[in-house]
A protein has these predicted regions:
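Extended, subdomain-level signal for the structured scaffold at the beginning of enzyme domains
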Residues: 1-92, 96, 105-108, 113-114, ...
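Short, thiol/selenol-centered motifs that function as redox-active sites or metal-ligating centers
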Residues: 99-100
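Anionic-ligand binding patches
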Residues: 117
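Short, acidic/turn-prone active-site loops that include or flank metal/cofactor-
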Residues: 121-125
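Conserved catalytic-core motifs of GNAT/GCN5-like acyltransferases
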Residues: 137
Length: 184
């Protein structure tokens, strides 16, 4: 059974983090909210109790997801133990995903070199490596990136597909197709 760690740092973007957790859990994918602390507060003052406190080891997970938000993304970027785990996942061929401003952590880890990625408008100016593409969701090998709060559902459905879940049933059941059409 696949297992996903959604990393929560103080100042994370609630829509991006909780949408991913909700959709993955609806798909019956094991998904833990892993925080730098037991309780974290999002960028819009929503407090969340994490499932697990980050101890520097995420090796029992198959995917790490980095939500955006500020200063949450900066906290992710600046945590050396997390950067080492991202690099380890990349070496092992495990999946990594980041949305909004969180690709700055992938950049800090040196994982965007020769990769296509997307992010929140303007954040690409902080990223020296990689090739920015203004798309809703970008997949390049084991890396998946997305733009921001309004793309969180599309991002989450892509992750479900990558992890072997039935994203189409979720899209239908959550009325995503009714609202956004068949091309999304």
């Amino acid at each position: 059974m696949v297992k996903v760690a959604v990393m929560l740092a103080q100042g994370f973007e609630e829509i991006e983090a909780l949408t991913v957790v909700d959709v993955l859990r609806r798909a019956n994918i094991t998904c833990d909210m892993v925080g730098f602390e037991e309780q974290v507060t999002g960028s819009h003052a929503i407090q969340v109790r994490t499932d697990r406190v980050f101890d520097g080891d995420l090796s029992d997970y198959d995917m790490i997801v980095l939500p955006g938000g500020m200063p949450g993304s900066a906290h992710l970027r600046d945590n050396q133990a997390l950067i080492q785990e991202l690099q380890s996942f990349e070496r092992e061929g495990k999946k990594l995903a980041a949305i909004c401003a969180a690709p700055i952590a992938l950049n800090q880890a040196g994982l965007l070199k020769n990769k296509q990625y997307t992010c929140y408008d303007g954040v690409q100016e902080q990223i020296l490596d990689g090739h920015y593409v203004k798309e809703t969701v970008v997949v390049d090998g084991q890396l998946t990136t997305s733009r921001g709060p309004s793309t969180a559902l599309a991002f989450a459905y892509e992750l479900v597909e990558q992890l072997g879940g039935d994203a189409e049933t979720l899209r239908t059941g959550m009325l995503y197709r009714d609202v956004f059409g068949k091309n999304h």
